[in-house]
Amino acid sequence: MAERRKFKKRFCKYCEQKVDFIDYKDLNSLKFSLSERFKIMPRRLTGNCKRHQEMVTVAIKRARQTALIPYIVDRKNVVENPFELIK
């Protein structure tokens, strides 16, 4: 049988700060949940709890609708620091 992956237990940074609402306009907090191609990262990588991961997902989708964050980035256009494109 294959060995099971061992994941380090991460703690939700929003629970530690006692955040009740995640605003879609706060791009500095949302960028930790996005990959370099602006895809939403899963819970096991970010360490968010289920409640806050759902809030982050909704906030990112709202930010995409209002054109604060791009939907996707082409492979050709990926830069070293993609969050320079946001400002």
UniProtKB/Swiss-Prot annotation:
Gene3D superfamilies: Ribosomal protein S18. InterPro entries: Ribosomal_bS18, Ribosomal_bS18_sf. GO terms for cellular component: cytosolic small ribosomal subunit. GO terms for molecular function: small ribosomal subunit rRNA binding; structural constituent of ribosome. SUPFAM superfamilies: Ribosomal protein S18. Transmembrane segments: none annotated. Pfam families: Ribosomal_S18. Keywords: Ribonucleoprotein, Ribosomal protein, RNA-binding, rRNA-binding. GO terms for biological process: translation. Belongs to the bacterial ribosomal protein bS18 family. Binds as a heterodimer with protein bS6 to the central domain of the 16S rRNA, where it helps stabilize the platform of the 30S subunit. Part of the 30S ribosomal subunit. Forms a tight heterodimer with protein bS6. This is Small ribosomal subunit protein bS18.
